[in-house]
Amino acid sequence: MTSTLSPLAVDDHGVDHDFDRAAGERPPVEVFGIRHHGPGSARSLVAALVDYQPDAVLIEGPADADPLLRWVLADGMTPPLALLGYATDRPQTAAFWPYAVFSPEWQAMKYALQRDVEVAFCDLPAAAVLARWPRGATHDDDDEPVQTADEPAETLRPISLEQHDPLAVLAQAAGYDDPERWWDDLVESRLDSSSPFPMITEAMGELRMIMGQDGRDAERETRREAYMRQQIRAALKRGRERVAVVCGAWHAPMLRWPLPPA
């Protein structure tokens, strides 16, 4: 597997998009912080995309997998399925990006392709991720590119703030002992027709200010989010006026408009 990363030299102020939300205008970038494989997230996401009417959809996923997106609507391409990335000279170094029919990312792909809307993955290329793993290393949960702290259901549990589990912290603040139950009540079993995404982004933003980041995960997440912002700026430079960004909820505050510095 080979890939070339070309940093985009985009001035933070190079794209001027003024809007008045109070007047009903929509921002040039809307971020939809989802939970991977969440049926409620998928349902709310499709409704939000229909409302926003984006002219570009950027999805958290390996940017070098963009050529595969054209197969999403192919006959027989039915989830569950997964993207597989591996180093050609050491195939044991591999990573998977799985999708179910109720995965928000899968629904976002279908939404865009069925409407001839530009769609692309916006996360670090798989080649860049795999290249950082030591030779001979094999995939494990700590290195899973698609699992961040807000997402993998099997690792969510009530823990302390210092252990950096955002869903558990928010659940505890809301009076829940079980973060799974809290998220289910908030999003997955949500009956309210209003979008949950602004609330999710605000909550994650406050939580990130309190919790901060440190260690290896912080370096990795900072690098990923900087790359995703580059892809958003590139879409705006191409003249896109409504860019929908579908990403794990933890990343949403760092990708919302106006964009933070690169």
Residue ranges and their predicted role:
Residues M1-A262:
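Compositional signal for N-terminal targeting/processing segments
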